């Protein structure tokens, strides 16, 4: 049995669905929201690499490297902001962060 394009696309769709489900179902913890967004980006990367290999084109793999770089920077900056916010406020609940809109 050979693993084809549909298998990779199915895994990508499942991961994307889990990430979307995590965003929709969890409205309290910011760290879980960040992890769900990262899971969705991982699903997009899997799809890009799968199409890149299927079409014998390196463009998808190059985009994946850029997305991974941006996602790593996003996660680092997001977690740093959360650490500073937690030190100042003592909580990272989404409801308390929404109070900042003022």
Swiss-Prot record:
It catalyses: a quinone + NADH + 5 H(+)(in) = a quinol + NAD(+) + 4 H(+)(out). InterPro entries: NADH_UbQ_OxRdtase_chain4L/K, NUOK/Mnh_C1-like. It is found in: Cell inner membrane. GO terms for molecular function: NADH:ubiquinone reductase (non-electrogenic) activity; quinone binding. Keywords: Cell inner membrane, Cell membrane, Membrane, NAD, Quinone, Translocase, Transmembrane, Transmembrane helix, Transport, Ubiquinone. Its EC number is 7.1.1.-. It is a multi-pass membrane protein. GO terms for cellular component: NADH dehydrogenase complex; plasma membrane. Pfam families: Oxidored_q2. The chain crosses the membrane at residues 3-23, 31-51, 66-86. GO terms for biological process: ATP synthesis coupled electron transport. HAMAP family: NDH1_NuoK. NDH-1 is composed of 14 different subunits. Subunits NuoA, H, J, K, L, M, N constitute the membrane sector of the complex. Belongs to the complex I subunit 4L family. NCBIfam families: PRK05715.1-2, PRK05715.1-3, PRK05715.1-5. NDH-1 shuttles electrons from NADH, via FMN and iron-sulfur (Fe-S) centers, to quinones in the respiratory chain. The immediate electron acceptor for the enzyme in this species is believed to be ubiquinone. Couples the redox reaction to proton translocation (for every two electrons transferred, four hydrogen ions are translocated across the cytoplasmic membrane), and thus conserves the redox energy in a proton gradient. This is NADH-quinone oxidoreductase subunit K. It comes from Rhodospirillum centenum (strain ATCC 51521 / SW).
């Amino acid at each position: 049995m050979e693993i084809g394009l549909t298998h990779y696309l199915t895994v990508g769709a499942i991961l994307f669905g889990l990430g979307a489900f995590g965003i929709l179902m969890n409205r309290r913890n910011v760290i879980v929201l960040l992890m769900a967004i990262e899971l969705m980006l991982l699903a997009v990367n899997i799809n890009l690499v799968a199409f890149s290999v299927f079409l014998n084109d390196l463009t998808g793999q190059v985009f994946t490297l850029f997305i991974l770089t941006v996602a790593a920077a996003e996660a680092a900056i997001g977690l740093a902001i959360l650490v500073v916010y937690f030190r100042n406020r003592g909580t990272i609940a989404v409801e308390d962060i929404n109070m900042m809109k003022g």
